[in-house]
Amino acid sequence: MLRVRILLIYLCTFVVITSTKTIEYTACNDTIIIPCIIDNPTKYIRWKLDNHDILTYNKTSKTTILSKWHTSARLHSLSDSDVSLIMEYKDILPGTYTCGDNTGIKYTVKLIQRHTNWFNDYQTMLMFIFTGITLFLLFLEIAYTSISVVFSTNLGILQVFGCVIAMIELCGAFLFYPSMFTLRHIIGLLMMTLPSIFLIITKVFSFWLLCKLSCAVHLIIYYQLAGYILTVLGLGLSLKECVDGTLLLSGLGTIMVSEHFGLLFLVCFPSTQRDYY
């Protein structure tokens, strides 16, 4: 009878007590803490991802054994009960993480990766607004040029060129929405922004056809070129998740403002009409 009682006590000591929790993480997290609370852990603490060891901490010798795939892993605290795991984003993999001690007490956390938007909603909305207004102003610029001069080969080239720019940027807008960080959305953003350099060519063509090339026009063109440079720099800094798109927006906004100035100059400053046959 005494042996039976001792055996029951021994089995109860090593009973597996499991608690499960689900948490999410995104690419915006530099480090991730996976919580684990074990009251009075005994000899060692072991963390696993599915069936693979990540970290083993020996309380007696104060030593830690790490997996070569999770070199940034460490215990968040060495207190008696808080044995949460902290790792850098580069070492994190989605899956089931388990912490436990030698008594069989286990705490299970299911880690799920949640994909976030590339840019926040406010910045995404401004990108579409700036691009849309710029294309509308381009259409007005070409339309005004078309009704101001007699049709010619050069005017036909301007019209076709403007249509190609508009088609590329509109296709890019469809690919970019919604602003997730995938290959499709990266291509969409490139198609929305990079063709802006050709707006300078259309502007020069329009002013040349209307005989309005002057110092003021050169200033507008330089201003638009500065906006394009800001756009390219902002685009280069934005080719990763969870970034601030302020510089990119500044470039797109500058291009939009230069289109406003260009259209006003075309309309408000008269010149001698040139006819082409």
Swiss-Prot record:
Pfam families: CD47, V-set_CD47. It is found in: Host membrane. GO terms for cellular component: extracellular exosome; host cell membrane; plasma membrane. It is a multi-pass membrane protein. Promotes, when overexpressed, the influx of extracellular Ca(2+), leading to membrane permeability and host cell necrosis. Signal peptide: none annotated. It comes from Monkeypox virus. Keywords: Glycoprotein, Host membrane, Membrane, Transmembrane, Transmembrane helix. GO terms for biological process: positive regulation of cell-cell adhesion; positive regulation of inflammatory response; positive regulation of phagocytosis. Its main location: host cell. This is Protein OPG166. The lineage of its organism: Viruses, Varidnaviria, Bamfordvirae, Nucleocytoviricota, Pokkesviricetes. Belongs to the orthopoxvirus OPG166 protein family. One of its GO terms (molecular function) is thrombospondin receptor activity. The keyword Transmembrane helix applies.
